[in-house]
């Protein structure tokens, strides 16, 4: 599995050229993309500027010597490469297994070309087997948890040890065990309109390419109506 993730990440790095501002994703597959960019910066003199999606990726990029800028200091990003936890046939996806969904979506929004790197196990018929992360403000989080519980969403707080996990943005994550999300777009709109929800892990209609690594090789899928 790790070998497939590495292949996908390295393949995505081939889309990066000199002078680009690039979004650096978070997670086990995006990790290999960032590593490959770091190698090219060091060995090939690749000239890029990175915008990171988490404190973890920031630390990784700094160690590798990749120059970084804040999202507030750029107007657009040429290319962002990130992982995904599930991708359906309509190129909607669930992200946030690494608890970085808010920053990931902020970086994805001004991106000209958005690529996901996954292994074949992440490609699914319907989203929802992977729990949907919902980032919520700490104030009123328990009330919101009960709202989700009453709606039948089978919520659970994301934990770190014995305590609730706190994101880089100082929020909590409530994971929803939905089983199958029949209409991801409609459910995303429902969550968008829920007071106390900062962001959710449904990335609908955002991705341009999905690089899928399997035992048979690498496939690049093009989203027909991205953006």
Swiss-Prot record:
Pfam families referenced in this protein's UniProt entry, alphabetically: Rib_5-P_isom_A
Subunit-level organization: Homodimer.
UniProt-listed Gene3D superfamilies: 3.30.70.260, 3.40.50.1360
Single Gene Ontology BP annotation: pentose-phosphate shunt, non-oxidative branch
Positions that bind substrate: 26-29, 82-85, 95-98, 122
Residues forming the catalytic site: 104 (proton acceptor)
PANTHER family: RIBOSE-5-PHOSPHATE ISOMERASE 3, CHLOROPLASTIC-RELATED (PTHR43748:SF3)
The species this protein was found in: Streptococcus pyogenes serotype M1
Annotated EC: 5.3.1.6
Protein name as annotated: Ribose-5-phosphate isomerase A
